A protein has these predicted regions:
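Short Gly/Pro-enriched turn/cap motifs at secondary-structure boundaries
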Residues: 7, 18-19, 52-58, 107-111
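Residue-level recognition of beta-strand termini and adjacent short loop/turns
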Residues: 8-10, 23
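Cytochrome P450 core scaffold surrounding the K-helix E-X-X-R motif
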Residues: 39-41
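Mid-domain Rossmann-like dinucleotide-binding core that forms the NAD(H)/NADP(H) cofactor-binding site
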Residues: 132-192
Length: 192
């Protein structure tokens, strides 16, 4: 299979390796779409904190389920997944704050990601496509970040929300804050 690796800042290389074989508790996915996130841009540019090279980037993904024993999934299913792999054992995980896991492994940041034809992931992070197409599924992760922010801030109809940055997550924040009934103001350094 082909994959793209960021060997060092400012350098992508196209390489080949065998298709990975899923281990117990893992599934094999064929990548169909991938989003380019600010994290990927910063990693490519050499400014992403806690990052080591070489690394296969990519965590905003849409895929086809190929192989594994995940319950409720059939080969050919359209899927995406949660790219934040937590340990389940640390104090944060035990308290339900898996996003604060002290041992978190972010797919495409701490471990190799999805700029590859095929990937294996732990089956517990797999999500059904729910009728979305591959283009839409690649947006699930950034939109989930936006939805989480609006929910965590407990945005109400009486609120005025300032969104700083009108990239994909910012656009998601705008829409979710409007759904919550808030007045929204947007700032960005890019005029377009």
């Amino acid at each position: 299979m082909k994959f793209i690796v960021c060997e060092k800042p400012q350098e992508f290389i196209l390489k080949e390796k065998p298709i990975p074989e899923p281990k117990d508790g893992e599934v094999l996915l064929k990548i169909k779409r991938i989003g380019i996130c600010g994290t990927d841009i910063h990693a490519f540019g050499g400014t992403q904190p806690y990052f080591e090279y070489p690394r296969i980037l990519g965590h905003e993904l849409a895929a086809e389920y190929i192989k594994g024993n995940a319950k409720g999934f059939t080969p050919g299913d359209k899927v995406t997944f949660i790219p934040y792999f937590n340990c389940g054992k640390c104090v944060a995980c035990r308290n339900g704050l898996t996003n604060c896991c002290v041992n978190i492994k972010v797919f495409g940041v701490h471990i190799d990601g999805g700029m590859a034809e095929y990937v294996t992931i732990p089956e517990q992070y797999l999500l059904h496509g729910q009728g979305l197409d591959y283009d839409q599924l690649a947006l699930v992760e950034p939109l989930a970040i936006a939805a989480h922010g609006v929910r965590r801030a407990a945005v109400k109809p009486t609120d005025t929300v300032l969104v700083m940055g009108a990239g994909p997550i910012g656009i998601g924040l705008i829409q979710f804050a409007k759904i919550a009934g808030a007045k929204v103001i947007v700032m960005d350094i890019n005029e377009y």
